[in-house]
């Protein structure tokens, strides 16, 4: 599958790009080397149960929409689960609503969504009434600000990981990679995912959440907090205000650059005239 992905990249190096031929040869060389490589997890938790899943690369693409993770056919054994954890920075309402279907739940089913607060506005309460939802606390987001070297503007950071954990009885499926819980990512985009299989005794939703929460969900050390879709309203207003402030900063920086540029041109003109 990795070679299929690289072959797709070779075909999509445009002739107009710089050093197109060199880029193609480099990718082909990498593909040839990978064929001589064997992969092993060397893990007690996962054993050798793993698979690379390239999405959106044409005829050799893995059809993620047909994976058991997204099976919602009533009566199909693959559609049900005991635990589901979805961590995704970006969402589509339809994807989350399908995960939320009542008839997908087995006994004592737990569903958890970890996302960005700004995404909650895409959802209705009925889309997530079987989910417990978490977002990063404001103080964590504010504490992870990134400063742009060019404009010295602060840009807030939030979760980037895309992780899906599904448990049915003792079997656990873990998916890691680039695919958001969005319709486009699952059905259209070029993405790369890794599937890992394990057992409930080694990993499950509760153990995973205890890990990322740094203990129990209610502990003060937990960087996440429980929220509802109603919390999206205030966040949207805050986001709009932040975007406005960002645009004003960019405009001010742009105007400052123009003033400096005009000043330099004027000085050069004076020197030339002299």
Please report, for each region that a protein language model flagged, where it lies by residue:
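PLD/PLD-like phosphodiesterase catalytic module centered on the HKD motif
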Residues: 1-274
């Amino acid at each position: 599958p990795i070679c299929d992905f690289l072959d797709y990249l070779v075909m999509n190096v445009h002739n107009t790009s710089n050093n197109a031929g060199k880029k193609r040869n480099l990718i082909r060389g990498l593909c040839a080397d990978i064929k001589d490589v064997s992969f092993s997890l060397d893990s007690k938790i996962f054993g050798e149960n793993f698979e690379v899943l390239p999405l959106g690369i044409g005829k050799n693409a893995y059809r993620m929409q047909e994976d058991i993770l997204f099976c919602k056919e009533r009566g199909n054994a693959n559609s049900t689960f005991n635990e589901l954890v979805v961590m995704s920075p970006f969402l589509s309402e339809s994807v989350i609503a399908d995960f939320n279907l009542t008839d997908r739940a087995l006994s004592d089913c737990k569903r958890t969504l970890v996302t960005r607060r700004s995404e909650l506005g895409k959802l209705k309460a009925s889309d997530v009434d079987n989910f417990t939802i978490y977002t990063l606390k404001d103080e964590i987001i504010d504490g992870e600000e990134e400063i742009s070297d060019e404009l010295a503007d602060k840009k807030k950071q939030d979760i980037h990981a895309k992780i899906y954990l599904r448990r049915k009885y003792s079997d656990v499926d873990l998916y890691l990679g680039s695919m958001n819980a969005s319709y486009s990512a699952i059905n259209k985009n070029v993405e790369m995912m890794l599937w890992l299989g394990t057992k409930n005794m080694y990993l499950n939703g509760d153990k995973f959440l205890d890990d990322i929460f740094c203990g129990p969900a209610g502990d003060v050390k937990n960087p996440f907090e429980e929220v509802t879709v109603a919390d999206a309203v205030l966040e949207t207003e805050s986001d709009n205000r932040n975007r406005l402030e960002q645009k004003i900063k960019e405009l001010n920086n742009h105007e400052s650059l123009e003033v400096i540029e005009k000043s330099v041109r004027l000085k050069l003109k004076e020197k030339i005239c002299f």
